[in-house]
């Protein structure tokens, strides 16, 4: 299944902390970054390794290093930025690509307004990051864009997904794997995930209340 729910106890505990209605902006940011690190750990488990020799304190020693993987992290503005530092902690040499999409609150469809992508996407693994996979419209649009630019290895990391979004992403891009910290119950009538986290962008940036 292309959408993989990470059921590790630490992940489940931290998602529970995020759901608290009275969580502070500071705490929401911190836990979002922590979960992003854990999702990045899961999403890179199949990266190939090669042995190299390094000079250890005891002499030359063979060690494992990731082999030839060029990675670009692709936050979907604006909420995806809240996950970026957590992923960078795990992959500090990754390049950053940015995609700006906003959701039309009448149609629930994504509207593209910005992009700044690194070069040589055909040689890179792209990790799209966005806290919420609701209708999956923004995620599908971002995958479409990366494919048009030549990227062939595309993965996604989200905090919370709705079954509707899981189904839509799987139908549109069955080869794209997505790691999520939780698959929730459903979308409400205005396209919010239930129980969800509320507006993750507002909680990360401290806007609206």
Swiss-Prot record:
GO terms of molecular function: GTP binding; magnesium ion binding; uracil phosphoribosyltransferase activity
Amino-acid positions noted as binding uracil in the UniProt annotation, renumbered to this chain: 193, 198-200
Enzyme Commission number(s): 2.4.2.9
A Gene Ontology biological process term: UMP salvage
Name assigned to this protein: Uracil phosphoribosyltransferase
Lineage: Bacteria, Pseudomonadati, Pseudomonadota, Betaproteobacteria, Burkholderiales
Enzymatic reactions: UMP + diphosphate = 5-phospho-alpha-D-ribose 1-diphosphate + uracil
PANTHER family: ADENINE PHOSPHORIBOSYLTRANSFERASE (PTHR32315), URACIL PHOSPHORIBOSYLTRANSFERASE, CHLOROPLASTIC (PTHR32315:SF4)
Keywords: Allosteric enzyme, Glycosyltransferase, GTP-binding, Magnesium, Nucleotide-binding, Transferase
Family named by the database record: Belongs to the UPRTase family.
Leader peptide range in chain numbering: none
